[in-house]
């Protein structure tokens, strides 16, 4: 007797459901796409328990005829293609005829539908893919499909379901993408009876962007357009100042279908060129109309992977359109607009400084672990300009990003005289005047870490410190060196977060898309480890009323956004990695940059601090802080050491 058997239809549908119905969001996607294909102008999605208990999709589309309702639950039954030729000119979102039977096989499904041609509607009830009831229904134009108790008959699938908040976030993301793809349709998402998202459906894509990402984001989006013989490109991209740490905010649409394509993502970044910082990604919504013959959507059951003909030409079109859009306007960030994230604007009076920092050597304050212009230079400028007060502007000082009022001389004096509590722990008890360095202790640490005993010679290009020792010549990157010093300080500091808080006179507001808001609402307690306490405030917003004393107020907004990005982009949150990323970020931003001259005294102080580090050889991002040219290397460069012909001949003899 043969061993091969034909599986029954119910089992075959459950197997197919493994590909089509991965999670509740997959059900929402398939049902809403069917509603879009039915010509709906209004679609409402209601969920309970993140879709596991109930998913209900209601539309005002064409509806189904009575004889088609039962047939819709048969595998490979569809109204969207009729022959193989149709497979290569698909304009609908669905075409396989697998979604409804697959969903019905792992749930309890109810379909209520009617169309304009029939006097009454039809109601179908199915359980596990088996039709139990098929009866007439009072007429209501459109269709309502309810999916209850998802995966009730496949409990093993429930083991792989994440938290309800995570599943709800995926559902919200699906609705967000479909709303961006079809601004002409009004979408409403309801969770547990509460409205989560609503779009106007008036065809204005920018209004949809505002509904999803917030008005502030929509204001910073630039419209793009482009076309050639094969493609028509429209959409919006964000100004370079508005970025995130991952690609989740890039939406690419092919004929109204959300797709994922690495090369098209790369084309978007190429369009920005060097306007974007490394590791940052823009907001983008690109809608591409293409001849269906040039796109093969029959690649994967989810239909998110699409093979494109003339892909390189499309990449060029995208890059060119973005570059032209960003080149047309002024890209200087609006300072006042960027302050709108505050609940109240601070009223401050600042005076523009005339201090040419680039031309004045900086000195290193070991207590503050930072670089400052010498007081004599400031007093000289004060004397020459007859100015009573100037605003200190030191771009290398992490604590000063916005102008401050008051006398510069007073501020510098305060900084050099006062002992900052922040750095007390890193300042050796037995300090030498001027630098506060315990040379005996440093020597021991240097020996333990095998860090060379360096003699400072000069500064090269206002960026590198030229040093020597008995082992040869050394070049030290001043930015990487201080970044390593500050990284080790901040890593310890963040690991021992003080609960001391500074109340903000003007609290900060952080607006997120609904799907990100859901995730952060679940994980915001993780920020407590860093002394950051966010409260839910209004729709899709968090408010920060106070900040930890270790976080400077001038960097609050940027730093908190970086923390949020880390949490949202990490599938598994690691406090250790989080502290590393945060410490690396703060250290990099607050360290002295290239092209800043240092005097010899300050350069030596920086080298001594570097020698005390646990790992003085690389910065927090892995770049080397120091490179070495041995005596032999230098002699070889000047051909003082040469290999003889005899030695080469001997080496060839070894191979015989």
Swiss-Prot record:
Family note: Belongs to the DNA mismatch repair MutL/HexB family.
Gene designation per UniProt: mutL
Region (Disordered): 385-427
An example Gene Ontology biological process: mismatch repair
Record field: compositional bias (Polar residues): 387-410
Coiled-coil features, chain-numbered ranges: none
Residue stretches of biased makeup (Basic and acidic residues): 411-427
The species this protein was found in: Lactococcus lactis subsp. cremoris (strain SK11)
Organism domain of life: Bacteria
GO MF terms held by the record: ATP binding; ATP hydrolysis activity; ATP-dependent DNA damage sensor activity; mismatched DNA binding
Annotated Gene Ontology cellular component terms: mismatch repair complex
Keywords: DNA damage, DNA repair
Protein name according to UniProt: DNA mismatch repair protein MutL
NCBIfam families associated with the record: mutl, PRK00095.1-3
Role of this protein: This protein is involved in the repair of mismatches in DNA. It is required for dam-dependent methyl-directed DNA mismatch repair. May act as a 'molecular matchmaker', a protein that promotes the formation of a stable complex between two or more DNA-binding proteins in an ATP-dependent manner without itself being part of a final effector complex.
UniProt entry tagged with the keyword DNA damage: yes
Signal peptide: none
């Amino acid at each position: 007797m043969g061993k091969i058997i034909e599986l029954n239809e119910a089992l075959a549908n459950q197997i197919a459901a493994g590909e089509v119905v991965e999670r509740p969001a997959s059900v929402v996607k398939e049902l809403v796409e069917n509603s879009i294909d039915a010509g709906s102008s209004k679609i409402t999605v209601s969920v309970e328990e993140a879709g596991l208990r109930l998913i209900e999709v209601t539309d005002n589309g064409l509806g189904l005829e009575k004889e088609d309702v039962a047939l819709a639950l048969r595998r490979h039954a569809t109204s969207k293609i009729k022959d193989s030729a149709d497979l290569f000119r698909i304009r609908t979102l669905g075409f396989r005829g697998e979604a409804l039977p697959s969903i019905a096989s792992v749930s309890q499904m109810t379909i209520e539908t009617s169309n304009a041609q029939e006097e009454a509607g039809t109601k179908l009830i199915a359980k596990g893919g088996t039709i139990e009831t098929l009866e007439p229904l009072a007429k209501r134009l459109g269709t309502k499909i309810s999916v209850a108790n998802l995966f009730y008959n496949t409990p093993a699938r429930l083991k792989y379901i994440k938290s309800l908040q995570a599943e709800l976030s995926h559902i919200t993301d699906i609705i967000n993408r479909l709303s961006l793809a079809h601004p002409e349709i009004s979408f409403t998402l309801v969770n547990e009876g509460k409205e989560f998202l609503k779009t106007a459906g008036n065809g204005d894509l920018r209004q949809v962007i505002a509904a999803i990402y917030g008005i502030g984001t929509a204001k910073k989006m630039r419209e793009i357009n482009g076309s050639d013989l094969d493609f028509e490109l429209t959409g919006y991209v964000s100004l370079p100042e508005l970025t995130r740490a991952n690609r989740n905010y890039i939406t690419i649409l092919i004929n109204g279908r959300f797709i994922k394509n690495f090369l098209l993502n790369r084309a978007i970044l190429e369009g920005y060129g060097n306007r974007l910082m490394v590791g940052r990604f823009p907001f983008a919504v690109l809608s591409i109309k293409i001849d269906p013959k040039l796109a093969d959507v029959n690649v994967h059951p989810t239909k998110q992977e699409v093979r494109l003909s003339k892909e390189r030409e499309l990449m060029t079109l995208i890059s060119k359109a973005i570059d032209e859009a960003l080149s047309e306007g002024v890209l200087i960030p609006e300072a006042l607009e960027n302050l709108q994230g505050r609940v109240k604007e601070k009223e401050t009076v600042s005076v523009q400084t005339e201090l040419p920092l680039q031309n004045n050597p900086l000195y290193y304050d070991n207590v503050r672990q930072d670089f400052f212009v010498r007081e004599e230079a400031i007093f000289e400028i004060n004397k020459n300009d007859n100015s009573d007060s100037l605003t200190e502007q030191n771009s290398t000082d992490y604590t000063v990003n916005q102008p401050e009022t008051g006398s510069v001389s007073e501020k510098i004096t305060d900084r050099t005289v006062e002992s900052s509590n922040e750095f007390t722990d890193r300042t050796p008890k037995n300090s030498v005047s001027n630098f506060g360095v315990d040379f005996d202790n440093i020597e021991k640490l240097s020996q333990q870490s095998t860090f060379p005993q360096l003699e400072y010679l000069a500064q090269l290009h206002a960026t590198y410190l030229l040093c020597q020792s008995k082992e040869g010549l050394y070049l030290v990157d001043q930015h990487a060196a201080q970044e390593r010093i500050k990284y080790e300080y901040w890593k310890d500091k963040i690991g021992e977060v003080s609960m001391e808080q500074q109340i903000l006179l003007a609290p900060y507001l952080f607006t997120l898309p609904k799907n990100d808001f859901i995730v952060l609402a679940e994980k915001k307690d993780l920020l407590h480890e860093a002394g950051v306490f966010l409260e839910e405030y209004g729709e899709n917003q968090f408010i920060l009323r106070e900040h930890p004393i270790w976080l400077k107020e001038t960097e609050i907004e940027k730093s908190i956004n970086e923390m949020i990005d880390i949490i949202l982009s990490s599938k598994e949150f690691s406090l250790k990695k989080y502290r590393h990323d945060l410490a690396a970020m703060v250290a990099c931003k607050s360290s002295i940059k290239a092209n800043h001259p240092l005097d010899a005294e300050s350069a030596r102080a920086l080298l001594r601090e570097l020698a005390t580090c646990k790992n003085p050889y690389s910065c927090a991002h892995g770049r080397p802080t120091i490179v070495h040219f041995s005596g032999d290397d230098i002699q070889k460069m000047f051909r003082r050491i040469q290999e003889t012909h005899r030695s080469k001949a001997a080496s060839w003899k070894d191979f015989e």
